[in-house]
Amino acid sequence: MGLPRTSADSVLFSSYNVLNLFQDDTPAGREHYRLIVESVRALDTDVLAVQEIRAPDGKSARARLRQLADDAGMRCTVPGRAGGAGRSALAMGPHGYHAGLLWRDGIEPVPGSFRGYGKGDFWHSLACVTLDAGGPRVRYAAHHATPFGRQLRADQNERLVAALTNPRGGRPAIVGADWNTECADRVRDEDSGEWVLYEPRDPFAGLGWFDELIYQCEWDYDKRGRRRHRADRRPGDVLWAGGLHDVAAVLRAPWQATAGHHPDDSYGVRGISRRIDGIRVTRQLLGGLLSYGVEDTELTRRASDHLPVTVEYVPPAAAPASAAPSVPTTAPAPAAGERGRA
């Protein structure tokens, strides 16, 4: 189990929403924790972004991330600068859901590189740390997007882009997240030359309206006043237009759902399957992307309402620049004789 490694020089990076981990200490809660630990170990990944570490305060949240790291055979402590006190790579979310990063032995966090963004920036949080996994150092991030407010989600995705892509020409970055939205990345159609949606499927198409669709869909009304709805891709488009590229789209991976399988998923019980968990990279890493996969097993289906996703990549110095896929740029202005044509 786990994404097979195809290169001795590669790094495996995974993202996993662990479904209210540590929410309670009941027998069911302890069994849930056991399943999550077993799932993480089975991933056999190098770096892991996690979402939904539950805790009422910072001290207990950081302790719980350390517990998960210890039980999964990973690490999560970033040393301070100049030998200062270290800290767990966890970003507190203002609503009790926290995001963090784990990594295997042999990967070294850059002292003082941890950054956590929560209240005032995001509905949940963003955790970032620079890791040395061989080759150029890369900034890794874990994020959990807001489940409510489509415009808020788009606005906070702008904040995320700013945090991971500035300053211009800075470190390459890779982020694993529960995006809570549909992908809007485009890929070049080799026959027509047009840039088309990688993921044209609308998971809400053909379904009758229900109240929770206000969090995911745009809508209007026909001449008879009947409501028409469609997936709101604007939050996803902010990410792609801002220079954070969905690895699945870049690699043209076959579409595979990450949510909709679990009995606690209010969309899934209506037959809706979605790919809302994913990994995005800045342009510096595009040429090093090797493979992508969703860990869809009986174990991961039982453990969480989200399936873990993994990407294999080689650091920028080991990836030939010519391997980087093309990305669209702004189209040139039409010639004078073409202006005004439909």
Predicted stretch roles:
Residues 2, 29, 53-137:
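Structured beta-strand-rich core segments of catalytic domains in phosphoester-bond hydrolases
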Residues 13-18, 36-61, 140-141, 160-191, ...:
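Active-site beta-strand/loop signature of hydrolases that rely on acidic residues for catalysis
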Residues 15-32, 149:
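Acidic/histidine-rich helix-loop elements
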Residues 89-90, 265-270, 298-303:
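Short proline/glycine-enriched turn/loop segments at secondary-structure junctions
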Residues 91-110, 232, 236-243, 267-288, ...:
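Conserved beta strand-loop-helix elements of the APE1-like EEP
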Residues 96-99, 121-128, 273-278, 304-310:
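Short hydrophobic/aromatic beta-strand or adjacent loop that forms the aromatic wall/cage
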Residues 158-272, 283, 337:
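Metal-dependent phosphoesterases centered on the DNase I-like endonuclease/exonuclease/phosphatase
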Residues 176, 295, 299, 304-342:
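Surface polyanion/phosphate-binding segment centered on an Asp-His-Pro turn
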